[in-house]
């Protein structure tokens, strides 16, 4: 069967759908390449000029690395005409009226992440006080939270196979993993695991969790909050790098996603 088998109107609708899909796919590809390249360049600048990680310059550049997904998303959104100005961009990202479910999920996702890890006995408690959590929490807005604007709010919405949730999350997890590599090449950064397979699996699990949350959110704030909570709770308890337990940790969000997002 080809386009000749359809009526003229049906052919036009199919062509429009294909054009829109290709357009979204191109945007997603160019966004990913731009964000990855920009992060790599900034990372190399840090390694060349601030290798010891003890100056104000490397701190500012490290913050910039974490902001690149949001900055690139803002540039793409405005250039493509999806938002008319920076003000409208921030309004769509931060000032949407979210459902009660999205807020509940934002707090429940860290419970899932650490709760399953505790049940699997794959957590090491650091011994830090609860005060350390509250002191670190604001910093995670810059060191992780705002990257959700790029990954969930922008690129997740632009992947061409938008109705195929699992496929979309698999692709997004690869991009997110590649983006982290220049960051974890910095000598003073401690990654979740020095084993890239385990590190990717941890990213894969969080991709499904945050991705599912975005399906119920309009803006990026619920995803930002969930990301900040997971990062901040690491001050109190660290998920360990046991491959078997990490696989089980990933299986749960994958199965839930397969149940609720069947395509």
What is each residue range found by the language model?
Residues 1-88, 115, 208, 212-214, ...:
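N-terminal, membrane-interfacial amphipathic/helix-forming hydrophobic leader that caps
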Residues 35-36, 119-124, 135, 173-178:
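Short acidic/polar alpha-helix capping motifs at helix-coil junctions
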Residues 134-263:
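Transmembrane helix-loop-helix hairpins at the membrane interface
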Residues 26-35, 57, 61-68, 101-105, ...:
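Alpha-helical transmembrane segments of integral membrane proteins
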Residues 42-43, 117, 179, 183:
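C-terminal TM-helix exit segments that contain a strictly Trp-centered aromatic cap at the helix terminus
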Residues 53-60, 83-152, 156-162, 188-195, ...:
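Juxtamembrane helix-loop-helix connectors linking adjacent transmembrane helices
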